[in-house]
């Protein structure tokens, strides 16, 4: 984990950068620290087998960390008392009942090296009051997968997980319409809205035709009723939704999404609309299929999925911000109630801080990021130098999992 000490009021910073308005991010970053988790947790596979695949949250002022392979742990010290070397205690769970060792070792699938890729793994954790929620890639039947949800009552000694949301719909590795499969494109981000409701993202697993099917759970953001396990579609046409942040002040959901080759997106999703907001995948995108239009193996793909640059011309919603080339976008969070946000990246190994004035009628979509900045929007890139899989904001500090 990596800590940014954010204090909007102080005037001195180690990393100084300025904006062109009173909403400046200069002086926000006061100092940084890097923490090394204790070796016992590392041996269980937090970083050794799944590059930059760990997920963070807080509970009772302590840092909670879950590895991609399902190891759950908490810090001995409270966040305000952290030392440079973190000491984690493992929490016993029954998560092996749902995602045992055999699932992670699915190497028989085209001789895929699970140690290198971590296709089938934990995708996020989220703690709300005394409940913990975990998303993961679930094998519904032999070699057929989706993204599902578990939940349990928080306890630092033992957590018993139960199913919260799953579906019989799954994408088969061998037998699917698009003849492609990629479990990295699984989404899995969780945010709790209130006692009854959470939002949950699911990617397309590279089964592109499902994105425009309203009856499919894939390429969607779902609203899950935690009491009934029922769901409804909040938005659709998403390739791989990696980040979610609910801005309660404006009743807006900010979504960060992996594009294909180019075309990572930040979308502003208005909630509770009569029509399901549709963001265009896999008909419109500011990216290209891997290999581009000139690759012979892509000719049929572009016929079915043309990736038009315009979204509005084809009845879709334009992204608020898009990145071309891609940055390998991950989590997005709000920093305070003053419309300041930060989005993390894996490929670009950077943080992008930005401010958005919801009352500025001159800001239209889409907005392309060029060299870390974008016209009409205050944005600043801060290079970290490591892949950033997850981050949380707690007590004016950013904690990053690298």
Which functions belong to the PLM regions below?
Residues 56-60, 127-130, 192-195, 247-250, ...:
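Residue-level detector of Asp-centered blade-edge/turn motifs that repeat once per structural unit
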Residues 5-35, 42-44, 65, 73, ...:
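Beta-propeller domain segments
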Residues 15-36, 59-107, 145, 153-160:
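Beta-propeller domains
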Residues 62-66, 131-135, 197-201, 252-256, ...:
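Conserved beta-propeller blade signature
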Residues 179-205, 214, 219:
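Aromatic- and glycine-enriched pocket-lining scaffold segments that form the walls
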Residues 116-120, 143-191:
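Asp-box/WD-like beta-propeller blade repeats and closely related beta-sheet repeat scaffolds
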Residues 52-55, 124, 189, 243, ...:
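Conserved beta-strand position repeated once per blade in WD40 beta-propeller domains
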Residues 89, 167-172, 238-241, 384-388:
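Short coil/turn segments at the loop-to-beta-strand junctions that recur within blades
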């Amino acid at each position: 984990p990596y800590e940014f000490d954010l204090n909007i009021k102080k005037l001195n910073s180690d990393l100084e950068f300025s904006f062109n308005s009173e909403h400046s991010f200069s002086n926000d970053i006061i100092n940084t620290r890097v923490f090394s988790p204790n070796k016992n947790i590392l041996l269980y596979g937090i970083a050794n087998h799944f590059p930059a695949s760990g997920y963070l949250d807080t509970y009772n002022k302590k840092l909670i960390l879950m590895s991609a392979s399902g190891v759950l742990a908490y810090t001995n010290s409270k966040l305000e008392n952290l030392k440079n070397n973190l000491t984690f205690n493992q929490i016993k769970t029954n998560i092996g009942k749902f995602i045992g060792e055999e699932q992670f070792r699915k190497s028989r699938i085209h001789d895929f090296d699970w140690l290198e890729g971590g296709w089938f793994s934990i995708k996020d954790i989220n703690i709300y009051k005394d409940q913990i929620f975990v998303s993961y890639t679930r094998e519904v039947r032999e070699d057929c997968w989706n993204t599902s949800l578990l939940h349990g009552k928080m306890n630092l000694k033992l957590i018993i997980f139960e199913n919260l949301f799953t579906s019989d719909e799954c994408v088969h590795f061998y037998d699917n319409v698009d003849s492609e499969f990629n479990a990295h494109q699984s989404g899995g981000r969780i945010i709790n809205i209130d006692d009854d409701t959470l939002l949950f993202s699911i990617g397309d697993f590279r089964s592109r035709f499902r994105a425009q099917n309203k009856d499919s759970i894939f390429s969607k953001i779902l609203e899950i009723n935690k009491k009934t396990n029922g769901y409804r579609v909040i938005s659709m046409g998403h390739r791989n939704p990696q980040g979610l942040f609910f801005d309660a002040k404006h009743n807006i959901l900010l979504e960060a999404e992996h594009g294909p080759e180019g075309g990572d997106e930040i979308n502003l999703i208005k909630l509770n609309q009569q029509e399901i907001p549709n963001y265009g995948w896999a008909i419109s995108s500011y990216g290209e299929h891997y290999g581009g239009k000139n690759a012979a193996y892509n000719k049929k793909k572009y016929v079915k999925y043309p990736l038009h640059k315009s979204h509005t011309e084809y009845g879709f919603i334009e992204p608020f911000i898009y990145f071309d080339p891609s940055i390998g976008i991950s989590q997005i969070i709000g920093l305070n109630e003053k419309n300041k946000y930060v989005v993390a990246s894996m490929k670009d190994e950077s943080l992008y801080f930005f401010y958005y004035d919801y009352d500025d009628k001159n800001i239209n979509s889409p907005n392309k990021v060029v060299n870390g900045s974008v016209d009409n929007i205050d944005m600043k890139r801060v290079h970290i130098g490591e892949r950033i899989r997850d981050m949380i904001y707690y007590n004016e500090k950013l904690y990053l999992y690298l």
